[in-house]
């Protein structure tokens, strides 16, 4: 976590003469809206954005209203999430995951559990005996806005274990936890530092300089000021009115509390959160700053590479400058009064420290021993936070107890602290045109940083430093100056004698000449005066008219660029590679498109893996083949189980086959991977056959959730269910709430799976939507005139479905699925309380 801090503002102002005239307030003004973005084929909406034309300053009003507008539209392109996944498994959402994660007992499809939806017990291979993740692990997957210091929406799927079974032990909780597949390392280690660190700053200008991180963009000489603390924006907002009236010194007292430390995996191995993956899919393949800027607003500028979990405390107190001046309190005296055994957390009787207490009380407008401050607290229980907003000067034990109570609660409710960041564009992958979108997101991030460059602000007087906060500019004043524009007071000491120059914003890029374009800036914001220093850096810069990376991608992925620049002819599907596949296979292959082959597990590719769609609409494929490097199992027939289960086996390893219950094995049971990479004995004629049973005298009558197989009633598979009533169900094994149907619940219970109707916890059931004839559920019929499905009357039910118990208007009654569906179709609120008929009422 950022340091826990007690910040004391010490004013050193006596009487000031007015140095400059007051600046008139400047109100924020919006610029015009940009054109509408391309219509999104998935959401069928388009957006547009308006930038700030004039930032509010000198006490002027901020801009009011939203930056974005959204409207419905008719798309001309399809939805990328509806495309296939090639050799990978496709979740219901459209996200692709490795087939090795299917039927492993974990829900690796984040929102829909599609990878576990159609698994028979004989197919399910639980990869671990533990599924409990570390507490608060979801915090490690959040995005982060480095400009505002705020955490944003989740970008990493912290719920997926990636098929791994890595465990970590918590000595505090005395329990084992299973690590997410995205986390490389997670350590439970509580670090509490009881010694506070004290730093003094002679002005808000010095403090702003220290607590900001300079970042130079790819545009040489451009400097952006980033907030390094999540509380910085709040600090400037809450102290703005006070800092207009006096010049203050600052004393910062720092400390840290940590409860756990984590390191996330490298970008190429991270699984994206489904919502973030969808937004990446929705991004247009053409550069549209509004669309990419909206993604930055939602998910931030960076993701977490590593960090700790803990809490943050910062409180600001103001000190009467005249009282401090009268007491002749020097810098060392102030530090001693706020540290060691005479800290504000402890009692002090020294004369000069008593004078500092009086100065604190005078600035607070109170004569009591209770000092109210401006707190900034992250982490810990909210009930303890309110007690950190004040100090009792005569009750150091009480101060210490309130602090200790809050610090102890950080273990239960931590936040991410001490984070190390990686740019968000590193996560752009696994979506169509990923390389192009990654480059565009990087470009959008630079434009986003440009919006917050202080060059947009008018100069502060007396050498003050301007910064952009939202839609306003704030001035941070040098020592002995104050006011909304730092217009009051005088510069003294090292700061007197001159005003350093500041850069204007870069101009727009000029026209291309000889393959290059140029832009410029001036050192006039403000110009240097009174012997001040000139700006550091170049007044102009040039670059190639066409981005080299973009040109390279235009060759590799021409289909991601405007249609006027790409061919309209396509190659057929690429030739198949024995024991191999095409990486990230798509549905169309325009002229110039390159593809890359890979081999299945147990094989290694020999030769050139790249093939190209030529102008003759034929594939140019070099010599390549997949060379066997291990023994691989053939496709196993239904019911046949292998042990150990591995994607491939090295020389000398054995595999043993067995059959599920009710089946017997025909053929050898154990096989050896030989030096020739062939199985010994040869793997053929190995199968599971049903054990002989006496012939049934008559065909049994099966339940609705059963089917007849080999003269026996067996459980159906969930996908064999037809139209059935939607319900919310709870998986008692994973404790997840899922959307199922009455039929699927019967089938799963028949298979021995423990699903119950959820009580008090709901899922999102599909709303009523128009369906074409041929897709009507039990409770709807086809309207010949409109060719659409419409609600039946209860008396028109042709297929009853299951008999269920339904609560209608507070009363339970038994009815068929069709009858219940009719009520729901007509808009009545019904609740399925049991997938079986209601229990008879007691007489």
Swiss-Prot record:
Q: How is its activity regulated?
A: Membrane attack complex (MAC) assembly is inhibited by CD59, thereby protecting self-cells from damage during complement activation. MAC assembly is also inhibited by clusterin (CLU) chaperones that inhibit polymerization of C9.
Outline the segment boundaries, as ranges, of region: CCP 2: 616-693
Q: Which residues are glycosylated?
A: 36, 202, 503, 506, 509, 754
Region spans: Factor I module (FIM) 2: 771-843
Q: Which InterPro entries match?
A: C7_FIM2_N, C7_KAZAL, FacI_MAC, Kazal_3, LDL_receptor-like_sf, LDLR_class-A_CS, LDrepeatLR_classA_rpt, MAC_perforin
The intrachain disulfides are: 28-63, 39-73, 42-79, 85-96, 91-109, 103-119, 128-165, 337-353, 433-560, 455-505, 457-473, 460-475, 477-486, 512-545, 523-535, 571-613, 599-626, 631-673, 659-688, 702-713, 715-750, 721-743, 728-763, 773-782, 776-789, 791-825, 797-818, 805-838
Q: Indicate, by first and last residue, each region the UniProt record lists as having compositional bias (Acidic residues).
A: 107-120
Which portions of the sequence form the region Disordered? 105-142, 516-539
Factor I module (FIM) 1, as annotated region: 695-770
Q: In this protein, which residues make up the domain named LDL-receptor class A?
A: 83-121
All copies of domain EGF-like, residue ranges: 457-487
Keywords from the UniProt entry: Complement alternate pathway, Complement pathway, Cytolysis, Disulfide bond, EGF-like domain, Glycoprotein, Immunity, Innate immunity, Membrane, Membrane attack complex, Repeat, Secreted, Signal, Sushi, Target cell membrane, Target membrane
A GO cellular component annotation in the UniProt record: membrane attack complex
Where in the body, by tissue, does this protein show up? Detected in plasma (at protein level). Bone marrow, heart, intestine, lung, spleen, kidney, liver and thymus.
Q: Residue ranges of the TSP type-1 domain?
A: 27-80, 500-549
Similarity comment text for this entry: Belongs to the complement C6/C7/C8/C9 family.
Give the protein's function: Component of the membrane attack complex (MAC), a multiprotein complex activated by the complement cascade, which inserts into a target cell membrane and forms a pore, leading to target cell membrane rupture and cell lysis. The MAC is initiated by proteolytic cleavage of C5 into complement C5b in response to the classical, alternative, lectin and GZMK complement pathways. The complement pathways consist in a cascade of proteins that leads to phagocytosis and breakdown of pathogens and signaling that strengthens the adaptive immune system. C7 serves as a membrane anchor.
Give the protein name, as stated in the record.
Answer: Complement component C7
Organism equals Sus scrofa
Gene name on record? C7
